Design a protein with these regions (language model features):
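Beta/coil-rich, acidic/histidine-enriched accessory regions frequently appended to metallopeptidases
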Residues: 32, 253-329
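Acidic/His/Gly-enriched intrinsically disordered linker/tail segments
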Residues: 157-227, 233-234, 240, 244, ...
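Long, contiguous juxta-domain segments that are non-catalytic but functionally important
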Residues: 31-46
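Bacterial N-terminal signal peptides
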Residues: 11-23
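Soluble non-cytosolic domains of exported or imported proteins
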Residues: 70-82, 133-138, 142, 157, ...
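Bacterial N-terminal signal peptides that target proteins for export
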Residues: 2-14
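Juxtacatalytic substrate-recognition/specificity segment
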Residues: 49-155, 159
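Boundary at the C-terminal end of the N-terminal hydrophobic targeting segment
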Residues: 23-32
């Protein structure tokens, strides 16, 4: 009896292990179908059940790859709505009429980046840690970052700094305008992280230096300088936000392929000054090192240990406030 009982337990354990291995294998295979390579799995996405979220100017079609996620589906949809609201606040409408949004459950408790495509229609894929909490979603920047990509035409890789830099710059500004962040947080982050975008030894300008720092923070620095210069030239009536709305109004979403010159010329036309084209002529082919310390001082930003203070008497304090203020039509 003992031998038979032991045998039955062994068989049961073997069967259970096989079932577990099969389930894990199925989950891995399912994930690989949606995470394989650097292309959006459009066909696989279109076979999944979808939930549609209506936003001003468009519809977000949300699909979940197979796998467990701890949070209820509605909490995830709320996160998407919150992110879309921030992007809509910045651009005046959602950038594309139709967006496929694929969430792929992965191990862990955080959002593991994202990717945006436009070659068969606007699409975003987000690997989402299955144990992510509501707090993680509330503080997330990735979803807004990826949605901002949908508002800019696709460009050759050498100009990826504009796409990534714009997303780095616009994401927190949009979230402040939507009431999801406070201005102190984003200026503190800019003061901390913007130096990562400064030219290093051997730099050959934004167009020719595809390092991580230059692509992301060098591009964000370009956007900040452009925003300030547009506002200086228009008596603070218009800014980069108006310029990029102009690109979108001209049909320049991520579903289009435009050369950078067309993007910048369209943006300049929208605000009536050639700031973006001029800045690109300066910073694209050769390294330019702005005096960030002087810039922060002029914007009225003072570092106080780990915190910052605002000096509203500074020369560019009004511009600093206008950048994060809700846009007035």
């Amino acid at each position: 009896m003992k031998a038979a009982g032991a045998f039955r337990w062994t068989v049961a354990a073997t069967v259970l292990a096989a079932m577990l291995a099969s389930a894990l294998s199925f989950r891995a295979d399912a994930q690989s179908e949606y995470m394989r390579g650097d292309r959006m799995p459009y066909d696989a996405f279109d076979r999944l059940p979808r939930t549609d979220i209506e936003v001003p100017g468009g519809t977000i079609h949300v699909a979940f790859a197979p796998g467990d996620i701890t949070l209820p589906k509605e909490k995830l949809l709320d996160w998407i709505r919150m992110s879309a609201r921030a992007v809509t606040t910045y651009y005046g409408r959602f950038p594309v009429a139709s967006l496929r949004l694929l969430l792929v459950p992965v191990d862990g408790g955080r959002i593991r980046g994202g990717t945006t495509w436009g070659y068969r229609g606007a699409a975003i894929r987000i690997p989402l840690g299955r144990d992510s909490t509501e707090d993680v979603l509330q503080r997330d920047w990735v979803m807004v970052h990826e949605m901002v990509h949908t508002a800019l035409p696709d460009m050759p890789d050498r100009h990826a700094w504009l796409s990534e830099g714009l997303a780095v710059y616009v994401e927190p500004v949009a979230r402040v305008q939507a009431g999801d962040l406070n201005a102190r947080e984003i200026w503190q982050a800019m003061m901390r992280d913007m130096p990562k975008g400064l030219p290093q030894a051997g730099d050959q300008g934004l167009d020719n230096t595809p390092t991580w720092g230059r692509k992301y923070w060098g591009g964000a620095m370009f956007c900040l300088l452009a925003d300030i210069d547009i506002r200086k030239a228009t008596n603070n009536r218009l800014g980069l936000q108006d310029a990029m709305r102009g690109v979108l109004a001209a049909g320049g979403s991520h579903e289009q392929d435009w050369p950078i010159a067309r993007i910048l010329a369209t943006a300049d036309k929208a605000v009536g000054v050639d700031v973006l084209t001029r800045l690109h002529n300066e910073m694209g082919p050769k390294p330019v090192t702005p005096d960030l310390a002087a810039l922060w001082r002029d914007l009225g930003l003072k570092r106080m240990g780990e915190d910052i203070e605002f000096d509203d008497s500074a020369p560019l304090a009004a511009i600093r406030k206008a950048i994060t203020a809700p846009h007035v039509q």
